[in-house]
């Protein structure tokens, strides 16, 4: 039987790690957008090598399950970083001394970079190229025309997908308990082990994820309305 009196206690236990989960997701999506934008701009050109290279990169992260990506990074990254850390610190750093957080961040940044590069590339292509040409014809430099005319419109087109993948990353972070990083799911698992409760902590975890999604969606909708109210719209 489910003891509903345990749910508030489990929710409070899980709530302690919510800021950490949100931060990990934010860092992942932020750098994913940053690097994805760079890749998207590069792929707008006609360089066959660049297009093939990044097409393979995107294809890999779209096809391979997140848990497999995480394990590949987790078991290989410490052996790559240990010599670097040793060189900078002047002391020997062994692979198992490298924090698993590095693996989590790298894995999810690469994951978001792959998806956001496609999202941003599509958004850039959705902007009428005639606006860019008209701006250049009026005396704007190519860079200024791109950053002042094309980029703001593409940003608004891509914005919903940014938020969608932020929520998706929050949920995917439930995988990180497998590499000894504590997130919301891991916290529920710890509660289950500590108090020998099998159902309540996971129901509380589901409520926490659901409530968080509702709150973040509301905040995003309000922010998007403000942006559109300031003239940031798809037809700008």
Task: Label the model's feature ranges.
Residues 1-236:
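Transmembrane alpha-helices and adjacent helix-loop boundaries
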């Amino acid at each position: 039987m489910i003891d509903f009196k345990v749910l508030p206690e489990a929710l409070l236990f899980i709530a302690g790690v919510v800021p950490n989960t949100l931060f990990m997701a934010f860092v992942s999506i932020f750098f994913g957008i940053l690097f994805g934008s760079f890749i998207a701009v590069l792929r707008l050109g006609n360089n066959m090598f660049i297009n093939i290279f990044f097409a393979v990169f995107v294809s890999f992260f779209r096809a391979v399950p997140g848990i497999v990506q995480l394990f590949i990074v987790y078991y290989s990254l410490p052996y790559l970083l240990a010599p670097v850390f040793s060189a900078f610190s002047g002391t020997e750093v062994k692979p198992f001394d490298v924090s698993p957080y590095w693996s989590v961040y790298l894995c999810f940044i690469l994951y978001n970079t792959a998806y956001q590069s496609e999202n941003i590339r599509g958004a850039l292509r959705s902007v009428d190229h005639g606006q860019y040409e008209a701006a250049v014809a009026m005396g704007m430099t190519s860079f200024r025309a791109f950053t002042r005319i094309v980029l703001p419109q593409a940003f608004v087109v891509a914005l919903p997908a940014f938020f969608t993948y932020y929520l998706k990353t929050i949920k995917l972070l439930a995988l990180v308990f497998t590499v000894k990083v504590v997130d919301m799911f891991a916290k529920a698992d710890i509660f289950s082990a500590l108090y020998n409760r099998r159902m309540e902590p996971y129901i509380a975890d589901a409520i926490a994820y659901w409530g968080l999604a509702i709150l973040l969606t509301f905040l995003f909708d309000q922010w998007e309305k403000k942006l559109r109210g300031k003239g940031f719209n798809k037809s700008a």
